[in-house]
Amino acid sequence: MQVSPAIVKGIAVSSLGLYAGILTSSTVISITTPINVLTQHLKNVLCTLGCWSTVLGGLATGAFGLSYYLAAPGERPNYLLCGLGVAPLSAAYLYLVSLFNHKLAPKCTRDQNDLEKQKDEKLPQHHPEVKDGEAACPFSKMNNAKTLKPESERSVKCHSYMSLHMSIVTGITIFTFGKCILDGFKA
């Protein structure tokens, strides 16, 4: 069974587009939302979304790899190989950065400046007001009326560290997505 090059290109661009979109939206949410809202009100929702996004990205990358493998050897576009590795490599990189950040987090001291920055962070425009100990996210059944353990909270410094790495990976993913599309027009 052989797959035509057009189908391989279509699956490749769809897979990369899906992954780039998921990563971009996650990065924008992480950067624009104050850390106290992320950790106290949206943590479980974002973790669930992250798990399902990983599964969806894995399935799309698997379909891409399978279609590439099933294509005739002479009709496999080489420029798509870099796109095939983006999702697994960036997911592994972000996972390792996250593990390092969790190990580093207890060492990230929460000095008074960090606490003041966290309290002064503004919500995005038109966002309903969220106060500590008040209205948890309605979509997170597991988080309602629960308080987080003090050791699970992150300082502003540790949060910005993770946001920086997410931004870098998002930029690389979008660049690779654009490159695969533009190289597809040349081929």
Curated annotation (Swiss-Prot):
One of its GO terms (cellular component) is mitochondrial outer membrane. One of its GO terms (biological process) is macroautophagy. The keyword rRNA-binding does not apply. The chain crosses the membrane at residues 11-31, 45-65, 80-100, 162-182. Disulfide bonds: none annotated. Keywords: Membrane, Transmembrane, Transmembrane helix. Residues 114-135 are annotated as: Disordered. It is found in: Membrane. Its main location: membrane. It comes from the Eukaryota. Residues 114-134 have a biased composition (Basic and acidic residues). It is a multi-pass membrane protein. PANTHER family: AUTOPHAGY-RELATED PROTEIN 33-RELATED (PTHR37278:SF1). Present with 3210 molecules/cell in log phase SD medium. Belongs to the ATG33 family. This is Protein SCM4. It comes from Saccharomyces cerevisiae (strain ATCC 204508 / S288c) (Baker's yeast). The gene is SCM4.
